């Protein structure tokens, strides 16, 4: 499993630990990933995605999982999230006809 958020694309960053004497040693900054179940109102299904804590707040602020994923850019979504987005778009278009 990669250390990357499936909805925002946030991944591992690299930097330095800096001591009081200014010695620098390399370190990794890993995202705060959580495996969360999101419920889609349009598809009426539950999806389990690995997302960071900030993304959870962003989904709530956007008005739910469906609103967030429809608004999200396809370039940063994982392949699983893109498939979910296409499914939501397809069902939404079928309901509007």
UniProtKB/Swiss-Prot annotation:
Q: Say if the entry is tagged with keyword Ribonucleoprotein.
A: yes
Highest taxon in the source lineage = Bacteria
A single GO molecular-function term is:
structural constituent of ribosome
Protein keywords? Ribonucleoprotein, Ribosomal protein
Q: Which Pfam family, any one, appears in the UniProt record? A: Ribosomal_L28
List the InterPro entries.
Ribosomal_bL28, Ribosomal_bL28/bL31-like_sf, Ribosomal_bL28_bact-type, Ribosomal_bL28_sf
Q: Name one GO biological process term.
A: translation
Q: Which family does it belong to?
A: Belongs to the bacterial ribosomal protein bL28 family.
Please name the HAMAP family in this protein's record: Ribosomal_bL28
Q: What is this protein called?
A: Large ribosomal subunit protein bL28
**Natural source organism:** Rickettsia prowazekii (strain Madrid E)
């Amino acid at each position: 499993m990669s250390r990357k958020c499936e909805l925002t694309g946030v991944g591992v960053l690299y930097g330095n630990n800096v001591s009081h004497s200014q010695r620098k040693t390399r370190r990794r900054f890993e995202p705060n990933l959580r495996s969360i179940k999101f419920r889609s109102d349009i598809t009426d299904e539950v999806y389990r995605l690995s997302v960071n804590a900030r993304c959870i707040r962003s989904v709530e602020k956007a008005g739910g999982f469906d609103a967030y994923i429809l608004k999200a850019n396809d370039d940063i979504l994982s392949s699983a999230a893109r498939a979910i987005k296409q499914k939501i778009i397809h069902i939404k278009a079928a309901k509007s006809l």
